[in-house]
A protein has these predicted regions:
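N-terminal single-pass transmembrane signal-anchor helix
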Residues: 1-37, 41
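Phosphate-binding glycine-rich loops and adjacent basic patches that engage nucleotide phosphates
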Residues: 7-16, 54-64
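General N-terminal targeting signals
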Residues: 18, 44-50, 66-68, 72-73
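Membrane-proximal N-terminal amphipathic helix
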Residues: 37-63
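Periplasmic/extracellular, small/polar-rich flexible segments of pilin-like filament-forming proteins
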Residues: 58-157
C-alpha cells in the first residue's frame, strides 16, 4: 500500500478552530478604528482652532490692535471678529466666527474666558477642544480636552 502524505480532515478542522479562537481574541486590539477616527477628528479641529487664532492675531497685528484688551478685526468675508489682545475672544463673536467647522461639531461658552468645541453626539470621556482666551500676560491657547460627567469640555488630566 502507498502511504499518503497530507492532513486528515480532523487535523484541518482543529487548525481552523484554533485560528478562529486567535482571530476573535486578537481582532479587537487591531480594529479600534472608531476611536482612532474620533481622536483624529478632534486633532483636526484643534489644528483648525490654532490656525484660525494665529491668522486672526496676524490680522490684528496688521491693524495695530494686538495690544488692545477689546477690539475687532474684519475677516476676508467681511465678518467682524471680536479680539482680546489680538487673539479671537473666547466667545461666539470671537473664535466661533474665526474658525469654520462642519455640522458634526458644536461649540459653546465654557467657564470664564474659555470656549469649547465638541462632537454633537459627545459622550463622557469623548475628545473635545478647549480654547482659552488671551490675557494681558498670556496668549490664547487651544488644547485637547475630555467631556466630563457634566457634559462639559475640560482639560484632560
Amino acid at each position: 500500500m502507498k502511504k499518503q502524505a497530507g492532513f486528515t480532515l480532523i487535523e484541518l478542522v482543529i487548525v481552523i478552530i484554533i485560528l478562529g479562537i486567535l482571530a476573535v481574541t486578537a481582532a479587537p486590539k487591531f480594529l479600534n478604528l472608531q476611536n482612532d477616527a474620533k481622536t483624529a477628528a478632534a486633532s483636526g479641529v484643534l489644528a483648525a482652532v490654532q490656525s484660525s487664532s494665529q491668522l486672526v492675531y496676524s490680522k490684528a497685528a496688521l491693524e495695530g490692535v494686538e495690544a488692545s484688551p477689546s477690539a475687532s478685526v474684519s475677516s476676508a468675508d467681511n465678518t467682524t471678529i471680536a479680539v482680546v489682545y489680538g487673539y479671537p475672544k473666547a466667545s461666539k463673536d470671537g473664535i466661533a466666527k474665526a474658525v469654520t467647522i462642519d455640522g458634526s461639531w458644536s461649540s459653546a461658552s465654557s467657564a470664564s474666558e474659555t470656549y469649547s468645541f465638541a462632537p454633537v453626539d459627545a459622550k463622557e470621556k469623548a475628545d473635545c477642544v478647549l480654547y482659552k482666551g488671551a490675557t494681558d500676560s498670556a496668549p490664547a491657547t487651544a488644547v485637547l480636552g475630555k467631556i466630563n460627567a457634566s457634559k462639559e469640555c475640560a482639560e484632560a488630566p
